[in-house]
């Protein structure tokens, strides 16, 4: 939420430089308030689990948020009852005339496939086209981020030599970025993926900026320069036991070469309680994003198409470091701290 300060207060310039929302009295009196409207495109197999994880984060904001759920029409979910989908989900056709402050696009366990092999790829692109004129800001997660980066900006998806699985350090690129304001200089991010993105494609695209980066996990959080699109390559929304459940599931299947989740169990012992070491940054990211949307979205959402065409949406404040140039020279990753939490 913004703070209201006296007109002409000298601290205003400092607060502005640190990306802190402050309103002088005349601005506050003109401000109109309404609930934020979000729609979640849930591509994950376990719909209810993902709903719970995302709503848990969204609920941490003091803002009132209205949430709708979207599904694809070209792919039939098999891990949730049809009744649940009928009761709580609609396809794009039901939303095409609606406007939203935010869209959340989840990941999906299809990163090993070429985009064209995903049965809902064409529909995915249609949803992104709709969002470009009907949504103020979009948060993409994992495969959703890979797909959007490829479709929007030509960033190539690359298969990894082995699955990236565990909790990995990310280095903050700018302490005063809107989305990462309040982050520690090193934050932890869960990953469970078989693919990544081409960092060179990101570095050479003037529209993109890397907000957090890790030596092993690569870019963890990316945004457009106007923050209208945010791409999280990891899973900050994951609960404490999600990685453990994935590991146990694959072990019970008798799969060979099941990767062990790195930096997750104390002393790498799966009999011990896993560490929930990313929760604070997950909550802070989502609070920051919702707060930024609240401060900058138009009161009348039907103005989004015109404002976007005129390039008057968003903030257009770039981070202080050159996009694609990870700022790691000042930091040394911790290692062998007794828990093995910061390796990699």
Curated annotation (Swiss-Prot):
Active site: 142, 235, 237
Keyword Acyltransferase belongs to the record: yes
GO molecular function per UniProt: homoserine O-acetyltransferase activity; homoserine O-succinyltransferase activity
Reaction equation(s) it catalyzes: L-homoserine + acetyl-CoA = O-acetyl-L-homoserine + CoA
Gene Ontology cellular-component terms listed: cytoplasm
Binding site for substrate: 163, 192, 249
Keywords tagged on the record: Acyltransferase, Amino-acid biosynthesis, Cytoplasm, Methionine biosynthesis, Transferase
Chief location bin: cytoplasm
SUPFAM superfamilies cross-referenced by the UniProt entry: Class I glutamine amidotransferase-like (SSF52317)
Record site feature (Important for substrate specificity), residues: 192
Residues the record marks as site: Important for acyl-CoA specificity: 111
Pathway: Amino-acid biosynthesis; L-methionine biosynthesis via de novo pathway; O-acetyl-L-homoserine from L-homoserine: step 1/1
Pfam families the UniProt entry points to: HTS
CDD domains found in the cross-reference section: GATase1_HTS
EC number(s) per entry: 2.3.1.31
Family assignment from sequence similarity: Belongs to the MetA family.
Protein name in UniProt: Homoserine O-acetyltransferase
Source organism of the structure: Bifidobacterium adolescentis (strain ATCC 15703 / DSM 20083 / NCTC 11814 / E194a)
Lineage: Bacteria, Bacillati, Actinomycetota, Actinomycetes, Bifidobacteriales
Designated gene of the protein: metAA
């Amino acid at each position: 939420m913004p703070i209201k300060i006296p007109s002409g207060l000298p601290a205003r310039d400092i607060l502005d430089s640190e990306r802190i929302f402050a309103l002088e009295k005349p601005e506050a009196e003109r401000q109109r308030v309404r609930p934020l409207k979000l729609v979640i495109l849930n591509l994950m197999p376990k719909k209810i689990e993902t709903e719970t994880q995302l709503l848990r984060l969204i609920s941490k904001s003091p803002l009132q948020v209205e949430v709708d759920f979207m599904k694809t029409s070209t792919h039939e979910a098999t891990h949730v009852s049809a009744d649940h989908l009928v009761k709580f989900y609609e396809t794009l056709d039901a939303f095409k005339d609606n406007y939203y402050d935010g869209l959340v696009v989840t990941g999906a366990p299809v990163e090993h496939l070429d985009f064209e092999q995903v049965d809902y790829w064409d529909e995915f692109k249609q949803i992104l086209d709709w969002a470009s004129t009907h949504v103020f800001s979009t948060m993409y997660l994992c495969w959703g981020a890979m797909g959007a980066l490829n479709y929007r900006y030509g960033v190539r998806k690359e298969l990894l030599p082995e699955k990236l699985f565990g909790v990995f350090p990310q280095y903050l690129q700018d302490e005063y970025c809107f989305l990462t304001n309040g982050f520690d200089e090193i934050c932890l991010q869960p990953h469970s993926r078989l693919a990544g993105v081409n960092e060179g494609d990101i570095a050479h695209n003037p529209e993109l900026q890397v907000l957090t980066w890790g030596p092993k996990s690569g870019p963890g959080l990316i945004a457009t320069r106007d923050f209208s699109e945010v791409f999280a390559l990891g899973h900050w929304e994951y609960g404490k036991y999600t990685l453990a459940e994935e590991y146990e599931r694959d072990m019970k299947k008798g799969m060979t070469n099941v990767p062990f989740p790195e930096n997750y169990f104390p002393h790498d012992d799966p009999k011990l309680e896993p560490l929930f070491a990313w929760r604070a940054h997950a909550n802070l990211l989502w609070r920051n994003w919702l707060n930024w949307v609240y401060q900058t979205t138009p009161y009348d959402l039907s103005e989004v198409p015109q404002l976007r065409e005129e390039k008057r949406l968003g903030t257009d404040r770039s981070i202080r470091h050159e996009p694609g140039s990870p700022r790691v020279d000042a930091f040394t990753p911790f290692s062998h701290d007794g828990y093995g939490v910061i390796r990699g």
